[in-house]
Curated annotation (Swiss-Prot):
InterPro entries on file: LolA/LolB/LppX, OM_lipoprot_carrier_LolA-like, OM_lipoprot_carrier_LolA_Pbac
Keyword Cell division: no
Organism: Pseudomonas aeruginosa (strain ATCC 15692 / DSM 22644 / CIP 104116 / JCM 14847 / LMG 12228 / 1C / PRS 101 / PAO1)
Protein name: Outer-membrane lipoprotein carrier protein
NCBIfam families the UniProt entry points to: lolA (TIGR00547)
Length: 208
């Protein structure tokens, strides 16, 4: 799924930053920042580059997240897609193809990075080795999966002034999938209906 394989690292002017290699301190710092947002809405821009730096795809859209495990990612036209989870299953709707794919949500953080922002991250240290740097109002984390059966080799997650700012995922062949978040709003009331999907008439349904 294109949207779950997406992330962005902005060039951060960190000034004098301090690197922390203590995994327990990094886990505590990351979970503290993530748990501040029980709900989150934002717009995003998405950029995917191959291993040589060639641009493969650029999109934008909006997202809504709610703990535990609910998310809605809507990519704008011309590559419109809608990805929704109610915490148990996922709908991937492509209006151009008039097709929706429905599958069980993979609860592993290494397989569904969106759950870092919306799921249960109490056992995050079981999935990742984590380090971080902090300077000024910026905190930049690097997450390395502890198993090989993952979508990515490295995931970077950055916060600015306590809000998620950008993410980047790098896979085994060097492809980088990036997301930059902006207009981020936390802990506002969200309608539960936006985390379910009613299949439009005439749309093909694929169950996986």
């Amino acid at each position: 799924m294109r949207l779950i394989r997406t992330l962005f690292v902005a060039a951060l002017a960190m000034g004098a930053s301090l690197a922390h290699a203590d995994d327990s301190a990094a886990v505590q710092r990351l979970t503290g920042l993530l748990n501040k947002a029980q709900t989150l809405t934002a717009r995003f821009s998405q950029l995917t580059l191959d291993g040589s730096g060639t641009r493969l795809q650029e999109t934008a859209g909006q997202l809504s997240l709610k703990r535990p495990g609910l998310f809605r990612w809507h990519t704008d036209a011309p590559n419109e897609q809608l990805l929704i989870s109610n915490g148990e299953k996922v709908w991937l709707y492509d209006p151009d193809l008039e097709q929706v794919t429905i599958q069980k949500l993979d609860q592993r953080l290494t397989q569904t990075p969106a759950l870092l922002l919306s799921g249960d991250i109490s056992k995050i240290s079981e999935s990742f080795a984590i380090t971080y740097k902090e300077g000024g109002n910026v905190v930049d984390f690097v997450l390395k999966p502890k198993t090989k059966d993952t979508l990515f080799d490295t995931l970077r997650l950055s916060f600015r002034s306590g809000k998620v700012n950008d993410m980047q995922m790098i896979d085994g062949v060097g492809q980088r999938t990036n997301i930059l978040f902006f207009d981020v709003k936390m802990n506002e009331a969200l309608d539960a209906k936006q985390f379910t999907f009613d299949v439009p008439p005439g749309v093909d349904v694929i169950q996986e």
